[in-house]
């Protein structure tokens, strides 16, 4: 099977920007991503109306402000964001079953499942070269196709942690 971008098994490949549906997550995984960054869609689920005033401290719905008067306008609830992600997960499960995958990890980097002709033949794709994106590196089955080795962070052995432990 093809490996897509997931051959970099010691690194995380993250998809970010414009993720709104479970289908977006599936496409990212098939291209090799093993992490997914959502930002705008959960903000909308919590009540954001996209006024693009976050940096001005004048958010009219009270999400991105420290002004007590504006903060009182916030009517969002954490449950709305949780429900959004439940719907995403449900759609991902549904599409995985349609594609014949039982585990999410099985899907990472399986670019052969994508219908590439529709993308390549689309009028907006005229003149674009997708060969590098859909390249099959012909790696053996012994080569992992997703991030299965976690990084070793030296932060667990820093002096601060030892001092905090001693202070208890």
Regions from the PLM with identified roles:
Residues 3, 30-70:
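Flexible glycine/proline-rich, aromatic-decorated loop/lid segments
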Residues 20-33:
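Catalytic cores of alpha/beta
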Residues 101-158:
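Terminal amphipathic helices with adjacent charged low-complexity linkers/tails
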